[in-house]
Design a protein with these regions (language model features):
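His/Cys-centered metal/cofactor-coordination and adjacent catalytic loops
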Residues: 67-69, 74
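Positively charged n-region of N-terminal signal peptides that target proteins for export
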Residues: 1-4
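Sequence context surrounding c-type heme c attachment/ligation sites in exported
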Residues: 22-50, 55-60, 64-65, 77-161
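Sec-dependent N-terminal signal peptides
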Residues: 6-13
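Long, low-complexity intrinsically disordered regions enriched in Ser/Thr, Asp/Glu, Pro/Gly
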Residues: 9, 20-22
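C-terminal motif of bacterial Sec signal peptides marking the signal peptidase cleavage site
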Residues: 15-18
Length: 161
């Protein structure tokens, strides 16, 4: 009997461990901000350790307003889009380069449940190479351009369908 209970306990523990990484991100849409996001992507969970955008590894040609060249990283959540779009907690980090391939800025899309439903619930942030906040929140310059891709959850690079 003791062996059966011990076996059941082991199965339960293993099952719970398997679910730990699948929690839905519950960032508060009222308090999300660029300073905390920078700490997250530069220290706590460095974006440079994320995967490249699927099928696009390394620096590629860019265009305005992002720069002559870009390099795009995505966290694990952003690697799992569905027909409904990207899951909450998705982070898309784009390095924007000048023609001489000097890093000019970083532009971020962060999907936060309830943040801005009219614009796909994306929180937008722009940083200088040193982390200086150049813009954040419901940035109309970002929303205006990306709204033409509402059918792809406001994401340009490649279709997730």
């Amino acid at each position: 009997m003791h062996k059966i209970l011990l076996s059941l306990l082991m199965v339960l523990i293993i099952s719970l461990c398997g679910c730990a990484g699948k929690e839905e991100v519950t960032e508060d849409p009222e308090t999300v901000n660029a300073a905390d996001l920078w700490k997250r992507i530069s220290q706590d969970d460095p974006y440079t350790e994320y995967a490249f955008w699927p099928g696009v590894e390394g620096i590629m040609d860019g265009n305005a307003p992002h720069g002559a060249f870009i390099q795009t990283f995505v966290n694990d959540k952003a690697l799992e889009p569905t027909e409904a779009g990207y899951p909450y907690g998705s982070l898309i980090v784009k390095e924007n380069y000048m023609p001489d391939k000097t890093l000019a800025k970083l532009t971020i899309m962060y999907k936060v449940k309830g943040y801005d439903p009219q614009s796909g619930d994306w929180f937008w942030a722009v940083y200088g190479p040193d982390g200086t906040i150049e813009g954040e929140g419901r940035m109309q310059s970002c929303i205006g351009c990306h709204s033409v891709r509402a059918d792809q959850d406001h994401v340009f690079l490649k279709s997730y369908r």
